[in-house]
Amino acid sequence: MALLSSSLSSQIPTGAHHLTLNAYANTQCIPHFFSTLNAGTSAGKRSSLYLRWGKGSNKIIACVGEDSLSAPTLVKREFPPGFWKDHVIDSLTSSHKVAASDEKRIETLISEIKNMFRSMGYGDTNPSAYDTAWVARIPAVDGSEQPEFPETLEWILQNQLKDGSWGEGFYFLAYDRILATLACIITLTLWRTGEIQVQKGIEFFKTQAGKIEDEADSHRPSGFEIVFPAMLKEAKVLGLDLPYELPFIKQIIEKREAKLERLPTNILYALPTTLLYSLEGLQEIVDWQKIIKLQSKDGSFLSSPASTAAVFMRTGNKKCLEFLNFVLKKFGNHVPCHYPLDLFERLWAVDTIERLGIDRHFKEEIKDALDYVYSHWDERGIGWARENPVPDIDDTAMGLRILRLHGYNVSSDVLKTFRDENGEFFCFLGQTQRGVTDMLNVNRCSHVAFPGETIMEEAKTCTERYLRNALEDVGAFDKWALKKNIRGEVEYALKYPWHRSMPRLEARSYIEHYGPNDVWLGKTMYMMPYISNEKYLELAKLDFNHVQSLHQKELRDLRRWWTSSGFTELKFTRERVTEIYFSPASFMFEPEFATCRAVYTKTSNFTVILDDLYDAHGTLDDLKLFSDSVKKWDLSLVDRMPQDMKICFMGFYNTFNEIAEEGRKRQGRDVLGYIRNVWEIQLEAYTKEAEWSAARYVPSFDEYIDNASVSIALGTVVLISALFTGEILTDDVLSKIGRGSRFLQLMGLTGRLVNDTKTYEAERGQGEVASAVQCYMKDHPEISEEEALKHVYTVMENALDELNREFVNNREVPDSCRRLVFETARIMQLFYMDGDGLTLSHETEIKEHVKNCLFQPVA
């Protein structure tokens, strides 16, 4: 991977005689070439350039002296030694072995998960005791004094928990248990049955209701302040012995009254809102004839069985009854808190397996799920179900991001539905409270912006602010879900947004954060077994460790290649085989891309070697000789090269002959000429930079970018590696990712700019004159350095948005090739997140990323 170091060949102005550096008098002087030998010197004398080492990593100070006898000598340039020595790698890989039975278990899990996806219908979820109690209230439509759905009443009688409550036994949430228990004891009392259960429920209520005061407001279920006080009033009329004067009960009643006072009467009937979800708590104020006009197509009121049951008992509406029969046909003797959940289930299931890094096993299933979602996509947004009339930002943002990345035509304008006049984003129309999970999903969505999508930039700014504040407020977690580690998810998303979140690192992180027993909060607590389950997690762990073991074998082979090529003798360059291999392993990690990873790593290593050679080590004459040797592919020129350059060329010649032969087998045609041409263009860019340095020439910003986007060498790595992505690449396809393509140019541009923003200060301190920042300041001498840096960041961010569009829309290029280009751009954003992550990898987070990706198995 071409992660360019600071250029050292341009540190002394032509014509300079001396550079006095008394502060570094005790440092060692190391000779360096000076191309214009007689420039600015007295007749018969030559200038010699020296480099002195100062304090800190790779800190170099230049000085010039006159020497009438000696010719200029080559630089002895040193870098921090490589961290990943063989003994370090061996110490991390020897303790973990992948069991032979794991592969069979992986196959079994893949088959079981495929069946889960294929069986997706309207959404699978757990019983809601609260909603079942409301459905059980309905009297028989034939006029008999029996329940219309006796099986639901029986379910209540049979499903009381040992502590006297109703709800999910594995997770105690006081809000949820108290609400469900109150609903059940009222229903049993109305039907004059289950006296023992009622008494046990009352005792639970008395002893546990006070615990609500200790729970965070964010754990209060949706509509609790509407339905709970209404049911308490009903319980009081029924004569149930409950602690009606508890402080928290008074507070909830006050919240209800305040909310209803803020509610304009006309809005309840003007358009569908979340109030339709809680109509059972608004019975004293609802005009039932008006409310029927807002009924969903499926007969429900916002997919809520409880709300729909309340409307039916008031109106006798046949569509309400049809909906309730439809739900009970699915679940038998109980109902969930809302149904259907078809869009929610599919989107979150796809998102889950993608984040866990196992999506490659389920391509057909993902396509089927997304085709289904897209068929119900609405430009005003979507909700959790296909016929839900109230869109929410959570499902909409998740859908926008995933559908866009999978090539579906969706517009970011859909987010405008959820923005208020103050520029803030909300989950539902008319709602002011937000949750961490929905804002997290909007934030993730905002990073897949296209050029000119200001709504995405606004969403990014708004949600980043909200999420950073939420990290400081424990009570902010969370309104819509009780997740294993939502805080960890937020921290990861803010630190590693889309453009520097590599698939393998995200999988590693999400495996740790993912909760197979996570629950969501609607009107009651509910689970989604096709979203949160042990099978996803087990497969993710087994698959991660299996792939990691393959990567370790590949890395050992590549390290042997480095040694056998004689590159350990090259003291002027960086040995970073492991860090470079980490790059393709972090995104093209699948077993079938083993050759692609090897070619990517070898090519990238040569871009580093030759960058260091052209940047600071070889004379212009030697560099011209090397370039000619590559152009002519002529071994006879090797004898004229210095020893270290011979090693470079022989390794280069042998390696790319081997790569070309393998490419011929893969592509069915000779590719050596193609590879040589790719390298000729690369070496021309290196040579131009060397010439600029020798002449102390500072190009314009545009001139600099034109060359630097090539010299960054990402294009060279990608164009050669693309031959090994498993696709037969025609000339037409190659042209779409070739040097002239906008896709490749954007990759090089963003890579160059992120490099410069993090290294220009250090390079300037070493005497470097050309960087994006410095060249822009030359064009605009009136601006400050801070303004120039801001401009460079703006150019880069706009280019990343354009890169998103190229990645998504460039469908004439095979998926694997698109990934190769796009992910190479993203890995640069990661490597240069905090500085020079290649040269100083041992001092940056890259060291931990390498360890987690390649060596540390997941438990």
UniProtKB/Swiss-Prot annotation:
Keyword terms = Chloroplast, Isomerase, Lyase, Magnesium, Metal-binding, Multifunctional enzyme, Plant defense, Plastid, Transit peptide
The record's free-text note on cofactor binding: Binds 3 Mg(2+) ions per subunit.
Tell me the GO BP annotations in alphabetical order: defense response; diterpenoid biosynthetic process
Identification of the protein by name: Bifunctional levopimaradiene synthase, chloroplastic
What organism is listed for this UniProt entry?
A: Picea abies (Norway spruce)
Pfam families according to UniProt: Terpene_synth, Terpene_synth_C
For the ligand (Mg(2+) 4), the binding residues are 392, 394
Sequence motif DXDD motif, location on chain: 392-395
Q: In which pathway does it act?
A: Terpene metabolism; oleoresin biosynthesis
Q: What is known of its domains?
A: The Asp-Xaa-Asp-Asp (DXDD) motif is important for the catalytic activity in the class II active site relevant for the cyclization of GGPP. The Asp-Asp-Xaa-Xaa-Asp/Glu (DDXXD/E) motif is important for the catalytic activity in the class I active site, presumably through binding to Mg(2+).
Q: Where in the cell is it found?
A: Plastid, Chloroplast
Say which domain of life the source belongs to. Eukaryota
Q: What is its EC number?
A: 4.2.3.32, 5.5.1.12
Task: List the top taxonomic levels of the source.
Answer: Eukaryota, Viridiplantae, Streptophyta, Embryophyta, Tracheophyta
Function summary: Involved in defensive oleoresin formation in conifers in response to insect attack or other injury. Involved in diterpene (C20) olefins biosynthesis. Bifunctional enzyme that catalyzes two sequential cyclizations of geranylgeranyl diphosphate (GGPP) to levopimaradiene. Levopimaradiene is the major products of the enzyme followed by abietadiene, neoabietadiene and palustradiene.
Q: Which GO terms describe its cellular component?
A: chloroplast
